[in-house]
Amino acid sequence: MSTTGTPKTTAEIQQDWDTNPRWKGVTRNFTAQQVSDLQGTVVEEATLARRGSEILWDLVNNEDYINSLGALTGNQAVQQIRAGLQAIYLSGWQVAGDANLSGHTYPDQSLYPANSVPSVVRRINNALLRADEIAKIEGDTSVKNWVAPIVADAEAGFGGALNAYELQKAMIVAGAAGVHWEDQLASEKKCGHLGGKVLIPTQQHIRTLTSARLASDVADVPSVIIARTDAEAATLITSDVDERDREFLDGTRTAEGFFGVKNGIEPCIARAKAYAPYADLIWMETGVPDLEVAKKFSESVRSEFPDQLLAYNWSPSFNWKAHLDDATIAKFQKELGAMGFKFQFITLAGFHSLNYGMFDLAHGYAREGMTAFVDLQEREFKAAEERGFTAIKHQREVGAGYFDRIATTVDPNTSTAALKGSTEEGQFH
């Protein structure tokens, strides 16, 4: 009888927690026995999530920093890895705007179906796996790791602790390496750069983080759990139940019954310290790019948790040139990395790249006709020659040659291979 999928024993789980450096500083509000009880007799192998989690953890611990771009589609992710990035970021904002399962365009307010982000994680992984297959049959070794780790946005969890557990589970099945969770009220969730944000009590967000960790442990995957706080800008909180939040109450109440709170860096620091035992990385959402604010946050958190890793959002919601000069922009990432901000990302890079790229082409095409597209094609040829761009050969890029290989493996005498005799073979050398 096969032993594949047999879960670890309670003793083996506990030994891993006690001896594996991966779990240094991690607090669990549950026992190894409770994890074992929840596993059943078979645990599905989550190869992509496990592999991605291990790679991501290695990167953020051993590189100066990892910079990432938000991908909106599978092909965008492929281009990012082809160009030299080592990790993919997937934002809920972009999924809301153009990639959710309801097929609608939404603002970043958790209006889309909760399984939409896992669906896009799976799509991106499928695209990366195909790129890896194509590269292998072509003998292309220029990319070290095609199936790069994906950090995905769980927003505010779409509900309570059980919703968070199920969403983390879905992220793992889809192959996410890391997942971030924000401390907003899910039913009133807003983009970090919109108004009207409502915080949940510190203890409630710890419950969310605990649910995510439990789901990962039950799946036997070392998922990278990221805690985000929106306390820098939020002006409301649902309850005064947690004494850690009370010093920031401003004495006001709203028509909905929410409590007014004083925002800023101090509540962010307080929350980050509370989340640190439960999170592998911590992200403070900010309204402007400011090295001094980042330094204060890092020094305050790491004075108590010296090994705590941090994350930073290079948000397109900032007008970068209005805040920083070119020299500061050029050194910003390196200096953040030295402060412990090991995962740095541009959340909406895919949205802006996709929309501006198409607008620019359409603007030229509307006025110049085919000249505009030929200009684009010539830039593609130049990028292929000088920088390793491959999508100029679009049939090859999506796997026509790979599926020809399948066809000729099945029947070496086939006369219906796709690339042979194609215009791409004839004109794109």
UniProtKB/Swiss-Prot annotation:
Annotated coiled-coil segments of the chain: none
Record-linked PROSITE patterns: ISOCITRATE_LYASE
GO biological process: glyoxylate cycle; tricarboxylic acid cycle
Family, similarity comment: Belongs to the isocitrate lyase/PEP mutase superfamily. Isocitrate lyase family.
Record-linked InterPro entries: ICL/PEPM (IPR039556), Isocitrate_lyase (IPR006254), Isocitrate_lyase_ph_CS (IPR018523), Pyrv/PenolPyrv_kinase-like_dom (IPR015813), Pyrv_kinase-like_dom_sf (IPR040442)
An example molecular function term from Gene Ontology annotations: isocitrate lyase activity
Catalysed reaction, written as an equation: D-threo-isocitrate = glyoxylate + succinate
Binding site for substrate: 91-93, 192-193, 228, 313-317, 347
Taxonomic source organism: Rhodococcoides fascians
Protein name per Swiss-Prot or TrEMBL: Isocitrate lyase
Enzyme class: lyase
The protein's required cofactors: Mg(2+)
EC code: 4.1.3.1
Gene: icl
Entry keyword set: Glyoxylate bypass, Lyase, Magnesium, Metal-binding, Tricarboxylic acid cycle
